[in-house]
C-alpha cells in the first residue's frame, strides 16, 4: 500500500508517493536521492549515521517512517551549508581532522549542529555526552570533540 507525502527537504517542497512502511532514511536516500545520510546499524538506532534534522531537531531517520514526516521540515547534511559555504561545524570537522573514513561524519555533524544550537558553550564532558548516540569506529573521538569545541568557539565569536 502506498500513500502520498509532502515534506520540506532542505527548503524545497517534495511530494512523492511512498510505501506506508518505508523508513525516512530510505525515503531520503532512495526516493529523494540525497545520499549524504547513511545507514550503519541495520535500523536499530544505535549508530547515528542516519541523523538528520526534523523541524530543527536531530533525529535518527532509521527509526521513523517516511509517512510520519508528512508535512514536516527536514534538513539533511546536504542542506547544512549556506549558499555553497560550509557550515561552521563542517569546516571545524575538516580543519581538526574529525573524520577518517567519513561514514559517520554526516550524522556526527547533524547531531553537533543541533547540540550547539541548544548548548552553545559546552565543555568537553558535555560534548562527549552529546556524542553518545553516534558511533565512530575510526577516530577515537578526540578530533571530533576538538572539532565541536572549535565550532562552538567560532559560533560564539561570530555572535559577539
Feature roles, as predicted:
Residues 1-160:
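Signature of N-terminal electron-transfer/Fe-S-associated modules in redox systems
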